[in-house]
Amino acid sequence: MSFPSSSPAANTFLVDSLISACRTDSFYTGSSMYMPPGSEMGTYGMQTCGLLPAFSKRGEVNHQNVGMNVHSYIPQIDNWTDPSRPCRIESSNQDVQTTHSHQNIKEESNCCMYSDKRVPKVSSSEVPVYSNVAPESCPVDGPEIPVPGYFRLSQTYATGKHQEPYCHDPPDQSPTLIQLTPKPQPAPASATFADGESEKNKVPPEPATSRTPIQVESPKSATVEKICSPEASASSPELLQKEGKDSKSDQPANNWLTAKSGRKKRCPYTKHQTLELEKEFLFNMYLTRERRLEISRSVNLTDRQVKIWFQNRRMKLKKMSRENRIRELTSNLTFS
C-alpha cells in the first residue's frame, strides 16, 4: 500500500489505529484526516473499511474522481463479500457533515450480513483479519438488511444466491447472450446412442455361430468317451471302480455294488479285488505286513484298504459263525 509523503496516513500509528477501529467496532474520533482519491488507493482492505467507494454498477458513472471529505469518524465495516461482486454506493447531494450524533452514526453504519451458508465462502487469504467482525444489530439467520446510506447489493445477487456452485460471470456476458449460445452436447450424445444400437444389432449373430459347432461336437465327444471306457475298464480295475460309481443309476438294485435297500455300499471293491481278497482270507485269516503289501500291489489297493477289508471279513465270519451256532443249537433242541 503506497501513501504520499505529505499524507498523515503514512504514519504507522494512524494505520494501526484504523485497523483497531475496524476490529473493535468503535469509531475513530480524530479531528481531521486527509483522504486521497480512489485512484491512488486501490487495495481491497482500505476499500471495505469505508475509505474508498466499492465497485460501481454497470452503466453508472464511475466514482473514482469523487473524493471523500474530512470525517470525524471511520464507519464500521459495511460489507465483507467477494471483491468481484457488483455493489454500488448511493450518491448523496449533500456532503457529509463534520458533526454527527451517535444515533445517526449507528443508523448509517448498519451492515449487510449474510447467512451462515454465505460467510465461509469468503476466502481466508483475502480477508484474514476481519472475517469474524459482526455487529450485534445485524441478524445472522434472517435475510439481508438493506443499508440506508452505504453499500447495497444489486439484484443480481438475489438471483444467484440459491445456486450452490457459485461462480461469477464475466461482466461482458449478459443473460440474453448466454441463452442464445448453442449447446453442442446433444448432437454427439445422439450419435453415440445410434452407434450403440448398431453395435447391439451386430453382436447377437456372433455367439450363434460360435455355439452351433459346440453343440454338434459334444455328442461326438460323448460317444468317443463311451467307446473308450469299456476297453479301458477291461484292462485296469481302477477304471472299473470309477465306472461303477458313475453308472449307479443304470445298474439294477441287486447288483454287487449296491445294497438291498438300493443305497451304495461303503467300500465298493471290484469283483476281481474281492475274489483275490477272499482267496487270501480262506488261505490265511491274519496277514503279516509283508504279505499285506504284496496283496495290495497285486490288487491295486492301498495297505490300509487291505487291512480294513480283512478286519471286516473277520467280523463278518465271527457273526456268521455265531448265527450258525445258535441255529444248530435251536435245531437240536426242537428235535429232542
Swiss-Prot record:
Location of this chain's protein in the cell: Nucleus
Extent of Polar residues compositional bias: 209-221
Annotated region (Disordered), positions in chain: 161-256
Main location class: nucleus
Gene3D superfamilies to which the protein is assigned, alphabetical: Homeodomain-like (1.10.10.60)
Location of the DNA-binding region in this protein: 262-321
Keywords (A to Z) from UniProt: Developmental protein, DNA-binding, Homeobox, Nucleus, Transcription, Transcription regulation
A Pfam short name: Homeodomain
Chain intervals with Basic and acidic residues compositional bias: 161-171, 240-249
Protein name, UniProt field: Homeobox protein Hox-D10a
Function (record text): Sequence-specific transcription factor which is part of a developmental regulatory system that provides cells with specific positional identities on the anterior-posterior axis.
Signal sequence segment: none
Family named by the database record: Belongs to the Abd-B homeobox family.
GO cellular component, one term: nucleus
InterPro entries: HD, HD_metazoa, Homeobox_CS, Homeodomain-like_sf, HXA10/ABDB-like
GO molecular function: DNA-binding transcription factor activity, RNA polymerase II-specific; RNA polymerase II cis-regulatory region sequence-specific DNA binding
